[in-house]
């Protein structure tokens, strides 16, 4: 398992350095997507702590769909957040679903990669 955070835990390794535990075939999930587990409650109730998300890498410069949920990778973190347009064109706003968390104004230059969240799988509800 590898985790992304919904709350701001420090990044310890990149996806490429992780070992693949296996493969799954889930109806409605793109077979090219990667499944990762979410730790933290900043995206609750949309993405609860312990849920799995199917993510697919996209290009930051051309593929942002404002208001959609992404995994944002920086040098220090990989976070699940809703990306919103910022008044400063050099930044994006990272928004949490949980109102207990403040928005983060993130310089685009600090973002190393983004992955769109395609599906949320909450195993506790299965």
Kindly label every feature range from the protein language model:
Residues 91-126:
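Amphipathic alpha-helical interface segments
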Residues 1-49, 59-62, 123-126:
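Short, positionally conserved secondary-structure boundary motifs
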Residues 71-92:
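Short peripheral tails and domain-boundary helices/loops at the edges of structured domains
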Residues 21-22, 29, 88-90, 110:
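Conserved binding/catalytic microenvironments
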Residues 36, 78-81, 115:
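Small-residue-enriched segments and motifs
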Residues 55-56, 72:
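A generic structural signal for residues embedded in beta-strands
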